[in-house]
Structure formats: C-alpha cells, structure tokens
C-alpha cells in the first residue's frame, strides 16, 4: 500500500496537482458561497511557498539540476492576517512533525522552531501583523499540542501479534 499516492506521479505533474488544489479550493469555496474572509485562508495559508520536497526531487532527477522553480511554487498571496499566518504555521509544523517522527519533546520543539524560522526567512510572514511575541506563544502552544499528538507509544505484548484483547462483560 502506498502511503501517499502523489509519490507515484512525476515530480512536475505532482507539483501541478498540489499547487492547483488552491485554485480548485477557491472555486469550490466560491461556488458554495463561503464568505470572502473564509476564502482567504485557502491561498494565504500556503503563501508563496515552494513545494520543497517535490522541487528537490525534480532537481535531483535532472542531469543539469535546472528546474522551473515557478512550477513548484504556490501563487500566494502571503498571509495577510494573524489567523491565516497561524494556519500556515500549524499546517507546516504538523506536517514536519508527522514526517520526522521525533522521539523526544526536544526534537518536536526543534522542528517547530525550524518551521517558524523558515517561514520568517522566506518572507512568508512579512505581510501579516504577527509579532515576535506572538510567534513565541505560537511556538509554545504548538510544542505542547504536537508533543501530545505525536509522542512515541509503548507497544504492548498483545499488540505485537496484532491481536487486541477484548474485555468480557
């Protein structure tokens, strides 16, 4: 079983599918008459980020390392509100923690710090009113939440065999 069907598609095609889901989402939101403020979340939470994983794979798969970066970039706009910026950060942090499978709270916190720092360095938060104090609160909140969601679980002996013991009434 393939965990991610997009992995079966060529890199530029995969990027097109991923980037176009924003346009498709906006059309769906408009068709369903979602308020403009709600619709803003669809493009803004991706900003003008690059679909980095697929971009890197495409660069590695070419003989000269040249790839049209624009084909791997969301059209934007960058987050314009605290709320859309928070969604961008939450989406990025959750995905990074899920993909990395950290073993310790420190590793979770480091992933969160890196995602936030990356969004800042890439200018994704330049057009929203989040302050550094806000970002520190976000980092702490995400740390507590994601540590609770993705902490390593003990494997109990009866689970190793795939059997789940049912309690009898």
Can you name each region flagged by the protein language model?
Residues 1-105, 109-114, 118-122:
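Divalent metal-dependent catalytic cores for phosphoryl transfer on phosphate-bearing substrates
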Residues 10-13, 90, 100-103, 107-169:
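Long, compositionally biased intrinsically disordered regions
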């Amino acid at each position: 079983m393939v965990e991610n069907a997009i992995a079966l598609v060529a890199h530029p095609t995969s990027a097109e599918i991923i980037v176009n889901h924003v346009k498709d989402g906006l059309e769906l939101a408009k068709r369903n008459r979602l308020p403009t403020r709600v619709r803003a979340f669809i493009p803004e939470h991706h900003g003008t980020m690059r679909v980095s994983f697929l971009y890197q794979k495409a660069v590695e798969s070419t003989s000269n390392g040249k790839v049209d970066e624009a084909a791997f970039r969301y059209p934007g706009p960058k987050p314009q509100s605290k709320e859309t910026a928070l969604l961008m950060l939450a989406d990025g942090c959750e995905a990074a923690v899920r993909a990395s499978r950290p073993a310790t709270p420190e590793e979770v916190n480091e992933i969160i710090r890196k995602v936030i720092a990356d969004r800042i360095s890439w200018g994704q938060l330049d057009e929203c009113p989040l302050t550094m104090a806000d970002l520190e609160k976000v980092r702490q909140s995400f740390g507590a939440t994601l540590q609770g969601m993705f902490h390593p679980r003990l494997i109990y002996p009866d689970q190793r065999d795939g059997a789940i013991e049912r309690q009898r009434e």
